[in-house]
Amino acid sequence: MVTLRKRTLKVLTFLVLFIFLTSFFLNYSHTMVATTWFPKQMVLELSENLKRLIKHRPCTCTHCIGQRKLSAWFDERFNQTVQPLLTAQNALLEDDTYRWWLRLQREKKPNNLNDTIKELFRVVPGNVDPMLEKRSVGCRRCAVVGNSGNLRESSYGPEIDSHDFVLRMNKAPTAGFEADVGTKTTHHLVYPESFRELGDNVSMILVPFKTIDLEWVVSAITTGTISHTYTPVLVKIRVKQDKILIYHPAFIKYVFDNWLQGHGRYPSTGILSVIFSMHVCDEVDLYGFGADSKGNWHHYWENNPSAGAFRKTGVHDADFESNVTATLAAINKIRIFKGR
């Protein structure tokens, strides 16, 4: 008897919902065109009405990063028009951006940037990676995997691998740590001094902090003439040319100005990865950021938990960057998984 009542209640609920939705859509359609009961026309009208209902949402995720008017703090900082990747079409830097970028890692006599970029795009494609272009509808889930020791014994691996995109950075290994950090990598952010060998299908995103960084990537896949920047670097790398992407210097400045408010000398690869992902993804989850549960700052592949010299260089403001990501999580723009 109880089962019959539950079944009856479900049927009645479904009928009421169906009548309400049908009435709503028909009334809405009536204001646009004369209502017709031809099946094909009905489907078209319902489809158009659904599009109108969801058009104000930039994605189909529970929380869409690009959705505005939910946080004044976010709206003041997030600028969707700033392009994260350098291409042949957007390669010209404004003077103030160029002067600022030249100061990040000073060179004695940097070569002409325009000539360097022209040579760069003779060797690598000068187009945006089609994978990274935002879709009009959908939910692109991305994992940004940092290098914190809090990933050890976290068992996040399968969860990380379930994302559409998995972004890693610098010298981060996966071999030997698969259970905690996963095996999947779609994009890997590096600069010449932090490069590591990548998988065949991994897109390399070069983060250039100086002119020679752009020259190095050309050299490393052709002549192999550059072996030193401010420290020895790999002479040759094995990366497919169509898998090489360049982080836009103007986007680095955008992160520094808008998100870091001028804190630190320039942004870390970690925060650059986070803001980059917010511009190409609909939903972003962070793993391996911050200290472990004991307050130690170290890399997950290191056996010395008390390490953490990277926080003491004076180049990056780790505390301010951490506050930015914490605020983004508090307003439901990203999620942070803190591990152990």
Curated annotation (Swiss-Prot):
Please state the Enzyme Commission number of this protein: 2.4.3.4, 2.4.3.2
InterPro entries linked: Beta-gal_alpha2-3_sialyltrans, Glyco_trans_29, GT29-like_sf, Sialyl_trans
The record's CDD domains line, in alphabetical order, gives: GT29_ST3GAL1
Q: Which segment of the chain is annotated as a signal peptide?
A: none
Q: Which UniProt keywords apply?
A: Disulfide bond, Glycoprotein, Glycosyltransferase, Golgi apparatus, Lipid metabolism, Membrane, Secreted, Signal-anchor, Transferase, Transmembrane, Transmembrane helix
The cysteines covalently paired via disulfide bonds are: C59-C64, C61-C139, C142-C281
Question: Known Pfam families for this protein?
Answer: Glyco_transf_29
Pathway-wise, it operates in: Protein modification; protein glycosylation; Glycolipid biosynthesis
Return the broad EC class.
transferase
Q: Which residues are glycosylated?
A: N79, N114, N201, N323
* Gene Ontology biological process: ganglioside biosynthetic process via lactosylceramide; N-acetylneuraminate metabolic process; protein glycosylation; protein N-linked glycosylation; protein sialylation; sialylation
Q: Which reaction does it catalyse?
A: a beta-D-galactosyl-(1->3)-N-acetyl-alpha-D-galactosaminyl derivative + CMP-N-acetyl-beta-neuraminate = an N-acetyl-alpha-neuraminyl-(2->3)-beta-D-galactosyl-(1->3)-N-acetyl-alpha-D-galactosaminyl derivative + CMP + H(+); a ganglioside GM1 + CMP-N-acetyl-beta-neuraminate = a ganglioside GD1a + CMP + H(+); a ganglioside GM1 (d18:1(4E)) + CMP-N-acetyl-beta-neuraminate = a ganglioside GD1a (d18:1(4E)) + CMP + H(+); ganglioside GM1 (d18:1(4E)/18:0) + CMP-N-acetyl-beta-neuraminate = ganglioside GD1a (18:1(4E)/18:0) + CMP + H(+)
In this chain, substrate is annotated as bound at Q105, N147, N170, Y230, Y266, G270, G290, H299, H316
Q: How is it modified after translation?
A: The soluble form derives from the membrane form by proteolytic processing.
Membrane-crossing residue ranges in chain numbering = 14-34
Subcellular location per the Swiss-Prot or TrEMBL entry = Golgi apparatus, Golgi stack membrane; Golgi apparatus, trans-Golgi network membrane; Secreted
Q: Which GO terms describe its cellular component?
A: extracellular region; Golgi medial cisterna membrane; Golgi trans cisterna membrane; membrane; trans-Golgi network membrane
Function summary: A beta-galactoside alpha2->3 sialyltransferase involved in terminal sialylation of glycoproteins and glycolipids. Catalyzes the transfer of sialic acid (N-acetyl-neuraminic acid; Neu5Ac) from the nucleotide sugar donor CMP-Neu5Ac onto acceptor Galbeta-(1->3)-GalNAc-terminated glycoconjugates through an alpha2-3 linkage. Adds sialic acid to the core 1 O-glycan, Galbeta-(1->3)-GalNAc-O-Ser/Thr, which is a major structure of mucin-type O-glycans.
Similarity field: Belongs to the glycosyltransferase 29 family.
Q: What is the name attached to this protein's record? A: CMP-N-acetylneuraminate-beta-galactosamide-alpha-2,3-sialyltransferase 1
